[in-house]
Amino acid sequence: MKFCSKCGSSNIEFKVPPDDNLRRYCCNDCNSIFYSNPNIVVGSLCTFEDKILLCKRNIQPRLGMWTLPAGFFENSETLKDGAIRETFEETGADIKNLQPYSLFSLTHISQVHFFYLADLVEPNYGPTAESSEVELFT
């Protein structure tokens, strides 16, 4: 961090602020403290007739790799709404009966991943801007 996003000062220091125990970027001019917290990724493990829906990534990172539909959680939504949105964006599929399934802390990339177990409403899915292929696998 080179400049304070509150006052524009370049008087930034990476230090432990008062009453804290972790180093953070602090502005020495306006006394703002900047917290770096993990990003939340939300997704779904979708099933239909004992098969799992996977999508082949059409974007970086991991271009060309098969994965579960998932993406970054938005401020204005619930985790469940985020899983529904991401599944539709990446596969074109509608899902139902969402139940919490797994939670992973990926500290090496500062992310928390939350997945739901879900059912496909019907087997309508296909490629999207984010996925070059979408298929059900056994």
Q: Which residues does each PLM region occupy?
A:
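Conserved Nudix-box catalytic region and its N-terminal flanking loop in Nudix hydrolases
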Residues: 47-89
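Short connector loops at helix/strand junctions that flank enzyme active sites
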Residues: 22, 37-41, 47, 61-63, ...
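A short linear hydrophobic-aromatic micro-motif
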Residues: 13-14, 54, 97-102
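Conserved hydrophobic/aromatic beta-strand scaffold that supports enzyme active sites
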Residues: 3-6, 24, 45, 54, ...
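Unchanged
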Residues: 73-138
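Short histidine-centered beta-strand/loop micro-motifs
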Residues: 16, 36-37, 57, 125-128
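Acidic, metal-coordinating catalytic segment for phosphate/diphosphate chemistry
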Residues: 1-43
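A short beta-turn/loop motif at secondary-structure boundaries
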Residues: 19, 60, 104-108
